[in-house]
From Swiss-Prot:
It comes from Arabidopsis thaliana (Mouse-ear cress). It is found in: Endoplasmic reticulum. Residues 44-88 are annotated as: Disordered. This is Protein GOLVEN 10. GO terms for molecular function: growth factor activity. It comes from the Eukaryota. Residues 1-22 form the signal peptide.
Amino acid sequence: MSSIHVASMILLLFLFLHHSDSRHLDNVHITASRFSLVKDQNVVSSSTSKEPVKVSRFVPGPLKHHHRRPPLLFADYPKPSTRPPRHN
């Protein structure tokens, strides 16, 4: 792969990680962990082992909104110069 392909892949990965909503990812993680806990409990109840089984329950706290400023558009990046033009 050329360096342009590598740079574009890194940029896409960064943008995906930057724009993915952390609250949405937490909700997905919570539902996935609850689903796996239900499956684990079913497996444990059918087994006859006498070892104490620890089931860690993840209790979500209040979701805090992180105040982030909106990302700049690419059109805003070449910022206009604040220096007055020189008159020759």
